[in-house]
Amino acid sequence: MSVDLPVAQRRSFRGPALVVACVLVMSVCLTWAFFAMRAVMNVGGSCADGGPYVSAQPCPGGAGLIAIAIPVMIVTAMVGSAAAISVGAPNLLIPMWGFLFGSLGWNFLESAVTGPDIVWGWLVCGVVFELMALPAILAILAGVKTAVLPPDRPAPGTGSRWWVPAYALLGAVGFLFGAWSFAALS
């Protein structure tokens, strides 16, 4: 004797698998954007390759990956957020926003203060980028607090508590793969 579950109670692995894939792709793209920007900042902040004119500063290896990384990351965050909603996981747009602007702001700040003189333009950009990242980082911290210390005891198997460490682990794996692949492609 078998009992069929209603369609609404059947669990599919497609939604969670899509969220996992999106977190990994987002992490790789974030890493590529971080290192590509850093490479360009190391040659003065601007470069060019190809075209009818000869550039005074050719682009370093891997600099072009930023043109792929940011659009792919944005689309992946949107698709991943839609999938995350369907499985009760946190959205990916807020972490993407916070980590993108936070990491690029870090590059500006570090480049502004590591030379012989302070580069005020980069310092201002770094502060602005960090201020743009701040609301998302605060939202992430509030979400982590709620996931770790929920106000009410959640029912077993509901909510997104287990996604918090999963996102952190997947982000770390994506970062490592992104760093390795950036070095290989540069």
Regions found by a protein language model. Give the residues of each.
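Cytoplasmic membrane-interface segments at the C-terminal ends of transmembrane helices
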Residues: 4-17, 76-98, 132-165
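Hydrophobic alpha-helical transmembrane segments
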Residues: 14-17, 45-47, 66-80, 102-120
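Transmembrane alpha-helical segments of multi-pass membrane proteins
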Residues: 22-26, 90-112, 159-172
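Alpha-helical transmembrane segments of multi-pass membrane proteins
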Residues: 26-43
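Perimembrane loop-to-helix junctions flanking transmembrane segments
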Residues: 42-62
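Juxtamembrane boundary at the C-terminal end of a transmembrane helix
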Residues: 46, 174-186
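Alpha-helical transmembrane segments of polytopic membrane proteins
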Residues: 58-77, 107, 120-135, 166
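Membrane-proximal helix-loop-helix units in multi-pass membrane proteins
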Residues: 95-141, 151
